[in-house]
A protein has these predicted regions:
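Short, intrinsically disordered, charge-balanced linker/junction segments flanking boundaries
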Residues: 190-192
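Adenine nucleotide phosphate-binding catalytic loops in nucleotide-utilizing enzymes
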Residues: 176-177
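ATP-dependent adenylation/nucleotidyltransferase module used to activate substrates
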Residues: 1-161, 172, 181-183, 188
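His/Asp/Glu-rich metal-coordinating catalytic cores
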Residues: 164-167
């Protein structure tokens, strides 16, 4: 156990790791934040403002803030709208113009969630970022790999294929080992 020193007094308090959780206000990210808090992480909720067509992003941010308040965790909104347009929307449009079939989810994960969000969170003192993705992280031979989620019907590991090992060492996927039905049960039992 890691020990911390405070005013020259030794304590047996485990060093708490800080995780910034990307929160949409939906079931999966809300339960992810709850599970990480239950595991002893210092959880910070973050809503990524990426696309605010017809005010939908504002509603998601309100919902995420309500959940963060219920969990008693700090909450931030990171405005990434211009970067999202530049790195995801423009990429998608350019790909279509060039006769390609883009996957905006893959690009959003690479550039926004596990690019800009991860970098910003780390610069603010986070040890990890987490999301409500259904995927598993497995360490084998000292290397990190993405594996299919336990719930094959919800698996999102395909959308994360661009993440290199240096990023995988800084991310958590708390829902990777559980079924969606269990996630819903957790949500209703916690009244989030």
């Amino acid at each position: 156990m890691t020990r911390i020193w405070n005013n020259h007094k030794q304590t047996n308090t485990p060093l708490q790791r800080k995780v910034f959780v990307g929160m949409s206000g939906g079931v999966d990210s809300s339960v992810s934040a709850h599970l990480l808090q239950k595991q002893g992480y210092e959880v910070v909720g973050v809503h990524l403002k990426c696309w605010n067509k017809n005010g939908c992003d504002e509603k998601e941010a309100r919902d995420a803030r309500l959940v963060a308040n219920q969990l008693g965790i700090p909450f931030y909104v990171f405005d990434m709208e211009s970067e999202y347009k530049e790195r995801v929307v423009d990429y998608m449009i350019d790909s279509y113009r060039n006769g390609l079939t883009p996957n905006p989810d893959v690009m959003c994960n690479k550039e926004i969630k596990f690019g800009l969000f991860l970098d910003t969170a780390l610069s603010m003192g986070a040890d990890f970022v987490a999301t409500g993705h259904y995927a598993r992280l497995v360490k084998e031979g000292g290397k990190s790999f993405i594996y299919q989620a336990e719930d094959e019907n919800k698996d999102q590991s395909y959308f994360l294929w661009t993440l290199g090992e240096e990023k995988l060492d800084k991310v958590l996927f708390p829902l990777g080992d559980i079924q969606k039905d269990e996630v819903r049960k957790i949500l209703s039992s916690k009244d989030l």
